[in-house]
Swiss-Prot record:
It is found in: Cytoplasm. The gene is hemE. It catalyses: uroporphyrinogen III + 4 H(+) = coproporphyrinogen III + 4 CO2. Disulfide bonds: none annotated. The record marks 75 as: Transition state stabilizer. Homodimer. GO terms for cellular component: cytosol. Catalyzes the decarboxylation of four acetate groups of uroporphyrinogen-III to yield coproporphyrinogen-III. SUPFAM superfamilies: UROD/MetE-like. This is Uroporphyrinogen decarboxylase. It comes from Staphylococcus saprophyticus subsp. saprophyticus (strain ATCC 15305 / DSM 20229 / NCIMB 8711 / NCTC 7292 / S-41).
Length: 344
């Protein structure tokens, strides 16, 4: 590919770069006027199941904001339907699961994903983007076992994860069987994304902050090790791990075979660096700040970028996803500022 911008890959490898790379979680989709126009005609399901539409939405932020990576426009629920999870995305609520997991028999009933058969539209989207000469690396992704399991057990989003924790503490056989099943599914799903052309994988563990260190280490970490090792043993592709409200788990994450540790806004780059975290750090502007006046945004950007430069390996991102209310011109201005301020 002509003039490919590999800044993000070079940063992760520790090679020289011309600037700090930038991308935004949820950069594709709801904050873009072009996407909102599409949503007037098509449902979310229709957009994600039509490769041309999905590739268009994935490509938009690279063109509009000049980001250093594209992130596949999909939902972490995508691979669950093919294995027998009756999931519906409800507006204003999120994923609702009509057949929650309660027993070992429910886990045993789950099927196995065959990406070419079950999610061809995901692979077709990636291939289209590759053929379209996308000039930045494409990030594929999967949900992490805990976050997926929490939806599957609770039946949807939860504040306290009571049913999930109850299963962990009272029915280890079912819990670990579910972990194994989700690890196998995620390895198969991400492998297919990589073979289709994804160059980076991000594992989203959005809700893992609900656990303390002891429980994470015992109930979750073995599955995370298996998942990340399963990807890394087969492919020379960097893996990013991101969780929300989980700074207390940073030490545990640092010993996983990941390449990049994504931080939310609660733990600064400087603090993470001082904990001897040796991974590339990603983050971590509070997405709410994108609704603030520019001088406030700029001041926070400088602090994060200075800390990132001091750490050595840093990818600029938000501490969570872009809100629908954020103006596209703000995201473009942030990208331009990051590129200019960190010019090497």
């Amino acid at each position: 590919m002509h003039n490919k911008n590999n800044t993000i890959l070079n940063m992760i490898k520790g090679e020289s770069v011309s600037h700090t790379p930038v991308w935004f979680m949820r950069q594709a989709g709801r904050s873009q006027p072009e996407y909102r126009r599409l949503k007037e005609k098509y449902s979310l399901f229709e957009i994600t199941h039509q490769a041309e539409l999905c590739a268009y939405v994935t490509h938009l932020p690279v063109d509009n904001y000049n980001t250093d990576a594209a992130v596949l426009y999909k939902d972490i629920m995508t691979p669950l339907q093919p294995i027998g999870v009756d999931v519906e995305i409800k507006s204003g609520i999120g994923p609702v699961i009509h057949n929650p997991i309660k027993t070992i028999q429910d886990v045993e009933k789950l099927g196995h994903i065959d990406p070419k058969r079950d999610v061809p539209y995901v692979l077709d989207t990636i291939k289209l983007l590759t053929e379209e000469k996308l000039n930045v690396p494409l990030i594929g992704f999967t949900g992490a076992p805990f976050t997926l399991a929490s939806y599957m057990i609770e039946g949807g989003p939860s504040k306290n994860y009571n049913f999930t924790k109850a299963m962990m503490y009272s029915d280890e056989a079912t819990w670990f069987a579910l972990m194994d099943h989700l690890v196998e599914m995620s390895i198969t799903y991400t492998s297919a994304q990589i073979e289709a052309g994804a160059q980076i994988i991000q594992v989203f563990d959005s809700w893992v902050g609900a656990l303390n260190v002891q429980d994470y280490r015992y109930y979750i970490k073995p599955a995370m090790n298996k998942l990340i090792s399963g990807i890394k043993e087969k492919y020379n592709v960097p893996v990013i791990l991101f969780g929300v409200g989980a700074s207390h788990l940073a030490d545990e994450w640092n010993t996983l075979p990941i390449d990049v540790l994504g931080l939310d806004w609660r733990l600064s780059i400087k603090e993470a660096s001082s904990m001897n975290i040796d991974k590339t750090l990603q983050g971590n502007l509070d997405p709410s700040l994108l609704l603030a006046p520019w001088d406030v945004i700029e001041e926070r950007l400088k602090a994060i970028l200075d800390q990132g430069i001091a750490h050595g390996k840093h990818i600029f991102n938000l501490g969570h996803g872009v809100f629908p209310e954020v103006k596209p011109e703000t995201l473009k201005r942030v990208t331009t500022f990051v590129h200019d301020y960190t010019q090497r």
